[in-house]
UniProtKB/Swiss-Prot annotation:
<feature type="transmembrane region" description="Helical; Name=6">
    <location>
        <begin position="217"/>
        <end position="237"/>
    </location>
</feature>
<keyword id="KW-0813">Transport</keyword>
<dbReference type="GO" id="GO:0033300">
    <property type="term" value="F:dehydroascorbic acid transmembrane transporter activity"/>
</dbReference>
<keyword id="KW-0597">Phosphoprotein</keyword>
<comment type="function">
    <text>Facilitative hexose transporter that mediates the transport of glucose, fructose and galactose. Likely mediates the bidirectional transfer of glucose across the plasma membrane of hepatocytes and is responsible for uptake of glucose by the beta cells; may comprise part of the glucose-sensing mechanism of the beta cell. May also participate with the Na(+)/glucose cotransporter in the transcellular transport of glucose in the small intestine and kidney. Also able to mediate the transport of dehydroascorbate.</text>
</comment>
<dbReference type="GO" id="GO:1904659">
    <property type="term" value="P:D-glucose transmembrane transport"/>
</dbReference>
<feature type="transmembrane region" description="Helical; Name=9">
    <location>
        <begin position="368"/>
        <end position="388"/>
    </location>
</feature>
<comment type="similarity">
    <text>Belongs to the major facilitator superfamily. Sugar transporter (TC 2.A.1.1) family. Glucose transporter subfamily.</text>
</comment>
<dbReference type="GO" id="GO:0070837">
    <property type="term" value="P:dehydroascorbic acid transport"/>
</dbReference>
<feature type="topological domain" description="Cytoplasmic">
    <location>
        <begin position="359"/>
        <end position="367"/>
    </location>
</feature>
<feature type="binding site">
    <location>
        <position position="411"/>
    </location>
    <ligand>
        <name>D-glucose</name>
    </ligand>
</feature>
<dbReference type="InterPro" id="IPR005829">
    <property type="entry name" value="Sugar_transporter_CS"/>
</dbReference>
<dbReference type="GO" id="GO:0055056">
    <property type="term" value="F:D-glucose transmembrane transporter activity"/>
</dbReference>
<feature type="modified residue" description="Phosphoserine">
    <location>
        <position position="522"/>
    </location>
</feature>
<feature type="transmembrane region" description="Helical; Name=8">
    <location>
        <begin position="338"/>
        <end position="358"/>
    </location>
</feature>
<feature type="topological domain" description="Extracellular">
    <location>
        <begin position="208"/>
        <end position="216"/>
    </location>
</feature>
<feature type="topological domain" description="Cytoplasmic">
    <location>
        <begin position="423"/>
        <end position="432"/>
    </location>
</feature>
Amino acid sequence: MSEDKITGTLAFTVFTAVLSSFQFGYDIGVINAPQEVIISHYRHVLGVPLDDRKAAINYDVNGTDTPLTVTPAYTTPAPWDEEETEGSAHIVTMLWSLSVSSFAVGGMVASFFGGWLGDKLGRIKAMLAANSLSLTGALLMGCSKFGPAHALIIAGRSVSGLYCGLISGLVPMYIGEIAPTTLRGALGTLHQLALVTGILISQIAGLSFILGNQDHWHILLGLSAVPALLQCLLLLFCPESPRYLYIKLEEEVRAKKSLKRLRGTEDVTKDINEMKKEKEEASTEQKVSVIQLFTDANYRQPILVALMLHMAQQFSGINGIFYYSTSIFQTAGISQPVYATIGVGAINMIFTAVSVLLVEKAGRRTLFLTGMIGMFFCTIFMSVGLVLLDKFAWMSYVSMTAIFLFVSFFEIGPGPIPWFMVAEFFSQGPRPTALALAAFSNWVCNFVIALCFQYIADFLGPYVFFLFAGVVLVFTLFTFFKVPETKGKSFEEIAAEFRKKSGSAPPRKAAVQMEFLASSESV
């Protein structure tokens, strides 16, 4: 049938949309590889002296034996005494943690507004408007070498985080609305695939002989402006979402025109009838507030389970690995930690592609549990490898293998699954609010990990992943006892299972919109 094929216009439009997802991934990974170079620059800007060991590390990473050049405005002051040096080193650590975590702050703030902006401006104009934030953030970071680097990088990553918070809802929504029903799940996962591809590209570009060195690290940080500019140009040729035009604006003529371009056919009657049914069913359900999600017995257990799934995803330690993998591999004794980090990114991308095939064949709950159990054992082996590294040099390979497997198990289940399951927990009325709250909680947990991981790692040393092993075990047990299977079940069946566990009465209305679930998927 015509609606089942991928037309040139559809492929072009999806590619254009996931350029935002690519930027999202690039911004996640770009701060990792040049960590030592940027910290070294922070120290010089702030006048904090380097001890011999750190100097050797920094200059080796920089690929030069010459200290970083500092502009006259930031000339290093006279040497500090030992107490002042120790205190200032903590300041540098704090500024670096803020440089990493400020990205999540921006995403946390903006995550509630992606849907609102898409409804207000339309999907295309909303993505165009969001790119102004991406370009601003890239400009701030690109200029950071020539000013107070710590302030400009923190500001730039905050603004970039705002952009990513917006598009984390906009892009999956837009792709889900333009995709044929039978292709919606597969095309929806391209958001996640583009994201992890962005992470991988940022890690490759961050190699010291490419851009991750003292001369070019600011270019590396500002490079996300390139896909932003490209997307701004290509969006001018993309059709608006037909569902937005028909359901929100009630412009049937424009909706048909958009559908004809996307489907490559003049007969779009089936799509129009589907949207008409969706509009009628949506109009019978009232929107649900955040407070109602917790006070209404019909929604309380599903939202608590949804939040726990997202907490499990973030508190598993995955972003600690993504943000700080280079330093983790250094601790593990890997001679070329940046290349090991790139290996993590490659495995991340490969298993994201694998999950596209698995998610529709195995149950959501089954995949999530499989991933969590695998991650639990990986954190144990990772920790054992780090603890015994001083006694057995080959333990570095144990830790590295455990990290690779950890990422693989994450992408099999805990990475993509929460977004599918949260959408399946709720009908059309409460779904937007529930998804917004879930996205917000995801960003909050992301921020906590980004801000605190370095301090926790410094405090616990090689034992840090034993902590995450305990956390993963708790969430695994919660999933086993509390999370229902949703594969192949209607909303009424899922809601009935929740009501059975909570002992609440059936809701007055439960509209089924299972065909639109995949459009809600995000990172």
